[in-house]
């Protein structure tokens, strides 16, 4: 309601103008300034594209006369960037009388190594040096870039092409894939775009099995560091231009066009970049500006698709949970051919909340007008505290700030992980799911899995399980199963065909509120190239579901080894706080450098076991967290800090 509308009349990082998150418009020069001398003939924006996976490549390069003719040699050197290999050299004679001319050259990489998305293979990269040597002996010009050998095609849904839908099946290097992803929010309202900050967030995304990020039209084209790290980590990028909600109709056309041209030339060599998008949530993505973006995506690139809008043409955004106050059951059941956005907002880590509450950090409950309510999605003007109370209240009482935060974060876990898992089971009718979102540009309540200060929320570790290449998943249509007959579909998901040709066992064990075993059932099979396998249903009667809590543990085993574990919790609405009041067990912790071994030495399962480093949540990363440990079981957790750590859990003494 109090947004600064001026962003609609220029081209800026628009989500910090008060329509969301922050009202801190950034102005001025925000990158380093440098002077460069001009060569007699300049090389402009070399563009490398893949013609075939056998290493057939094409270089398009523009030569511009400054004070010497376009006569000389164009020399090209290609060398592996992140693996061992011999350099290759190519040379072309140039003899042109024009002032500016674009040249295209085909070349072939010997023994090519491909660039693959995260979890699908290696991210092989090459460095290229392009030099123009003038015939008259004048100073040469040299440009450097990097690239990957990677093809992208878009295939239709199984029903075939439709006029009202884009082709939404991503085919990378000839392989159709279900895309696992999230949204990317330009990461700082005051434009702190340091390499270290990028690397923290993107390395966390890699460990979450993220394969795609949608860099939305609420932000801006990122710095080179962002795309280089996405290349390194195998994270594909949908890059939208900075328009939102039909702002392309009022933004200066020339300024938008310059933004597109400059940035498209700058980033188009990155193999991680797989799609151009016109902007965010415009319900009428038409007109001269949108047409210009589409035309330039062909003229300046042509190797990747362009979409005129998002959500559009078969993709969906859904926020009935949160803005429409829908029950969590809504997210458990909703489906889409391709999820572009969905999620539930939650509070950050308690250390982060106390940090931005400052002198109000010990004030609870929250009062209207205080810092707590200001740091909500629209500054407390749209009933956000009531929404937080609703979703947190499904899990926890609101007696303390800590309980309120925990409940909010658990609601986010449930509202995200079930939608992602259901989407995966629907492949190939559903071809991808991008939850909203990875990160924040301002401290406060939001949909992110990592808060503004860098602290990781629980949803990260649960998405890590939901997006694991190999996992078993149960589908739930409601959060409360108490005293009801239920039949829960069970699926085996194996994106990388790790089980191909092998026998497997998927076991499901159900525990009640005394942590007694209610049901233990095994589903046995032999894998033959399936990435999605329906194993049947887990049936429970009313007596078996009559409990204030139910826990479901799904293990995938083969050749005598457990290969993955997933677990679920239901019935928590029967009594607030019951999820944290299960019979207790005891955990021991042993540290060896940055390796933490946690062991359940009690007689009952340990639920939600996690390690943290008090006071350093903004720096801390664990390789995995929120574990289910059977009695006697040990797990090793890698951490990234040398600070003291402690182990906690939902039922630990």
What are these regions (language model features)?
Residues 135-138, 232-237, 266-270, 299-303, ...:
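Secondary-structure transition/capping motifs at alpha-helix termini
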């Amino acid at each position: 309601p109090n947004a600064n509308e001026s962003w609609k009349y220029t081209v800026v990082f628009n989500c910090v103008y008060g329509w969301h998150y922050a009202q801190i418009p950034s102005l001025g020069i925000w990158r380093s300034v440098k002077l460069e001398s001009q060569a007699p003939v300049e090389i402009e924006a070399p563009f490398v594209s893949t013609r075939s996976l056998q290493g057939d490549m094409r270089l398009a390069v523009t030569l511009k006369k400054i004070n010497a003719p376009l006569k000389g040699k164009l020399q090209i050197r290609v060398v592996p960037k992140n693996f061992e290999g011999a350099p290759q050299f190519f040379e072309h004679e140039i003899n042109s009388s024009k002032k500016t001319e674009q040249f295209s050259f085909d070349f072939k990489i010997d023994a090519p190594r491909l660039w693959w998305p995260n979890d699908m293979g290696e991210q092989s990269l090459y460095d290229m040096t392009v030099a123009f040597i003038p015939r008259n002996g004048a100073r040469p010009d040299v440009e450097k870039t990097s690239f990957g050998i990677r093809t992208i095609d878009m295939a239709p849904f199984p029903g075939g092409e439709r006029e009202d839908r884009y082709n939404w099946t991503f085919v990378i290097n000839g392989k159709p894939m279900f895309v696992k992803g999230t949204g990317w929010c330009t990461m700082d309202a005051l434009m702190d775009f340091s390499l270290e900050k990028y690397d923290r967030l993107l390395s966390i995304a890699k460990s979450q099995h993220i394969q795609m990020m949608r860099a939305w039209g609420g932000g801006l084209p990122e710095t080179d560091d962002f795309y280089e790290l996405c290349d390194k980590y195998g994270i594909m990028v949908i890059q939208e231009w900075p328009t939102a909600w039909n702002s392309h109709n009022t933004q200066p056309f020339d300024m938008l066009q310059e933004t597109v041209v400059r940035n498209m030339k700058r980033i188009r060599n990155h193999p991680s970049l797989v799609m151009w998008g016109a902007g965010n949530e415009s319900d009428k993505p038409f007109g001269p500006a949108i047409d210009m973006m589409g035309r330039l995506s062909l003229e300046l690139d042509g190797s990747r698709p362009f979409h005129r809008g998002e959500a559009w043409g078969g993709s969906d955004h859904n926020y009935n949970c949160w803005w429409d106050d829908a029950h969590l059951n809504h997210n458990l059941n909703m489906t889409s051919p391709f999820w572009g956005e969905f999620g539930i907002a939650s509070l950050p880590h308690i250390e982060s909340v106390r940090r931005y509450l400052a002198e109000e950090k010990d004030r609870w409950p929250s009062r209207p007008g205080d810092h707590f309510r200001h740091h909500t999605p629209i500054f407390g003007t749209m009933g956000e505290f009531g929404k937080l109370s609703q979703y947190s209240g499904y899990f926890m009482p609101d007696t303390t700030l800590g309980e309120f935060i925990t409940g909010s974060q658990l609601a986010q876990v449930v509202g995200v992980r079930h939608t992602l898992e259901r989407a995966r089971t629907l492949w190939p009718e559903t071809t991808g799911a991008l939850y909203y979102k990875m990160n924040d540009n301002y401290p406060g309540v939001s949909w992110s899995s990592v808060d503004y200060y860098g602290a990781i929320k629980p949803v990260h570790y649960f998405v890590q399980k939901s997006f694991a290449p190999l996992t078993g998943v149960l589908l739930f249509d409601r959060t409360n199963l108490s005293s009801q007959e239920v039949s829960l579909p069970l699926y085996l998901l194996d994106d990388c065909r790790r089980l191909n040709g092998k026998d497997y066992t998927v076991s499901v064990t159900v525990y009640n509120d005394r942590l007694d075993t209610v049901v233990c059932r095994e589903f046995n099979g032999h894998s033959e190239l399936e990435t999605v396998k329906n194993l049947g249903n887990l049936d429970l009667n009313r007596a078996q579901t009559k409990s204030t809590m139910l826990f479901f543990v799904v293990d995938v085993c083969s050749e005598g080894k457990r290969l993955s574990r997933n677990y679920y919790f239901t019935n928590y609405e029967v009594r607030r706080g019951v999820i944290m009041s299960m019979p207790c067990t005891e955990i021991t912790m042993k540290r060896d450098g940055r390796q933490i071994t946690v062991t359940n030495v009690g007689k009952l399962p340990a639920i939600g076991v996690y390690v943290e480093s008090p006071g350093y949540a903004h720096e801390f990363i664990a390789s995995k967290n929120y574990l289910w440990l059977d009695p006697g079981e040990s797990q090793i957790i890698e951490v990234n800090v040398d600070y003291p750590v402690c182990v906690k859990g939902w039922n630990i003494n």
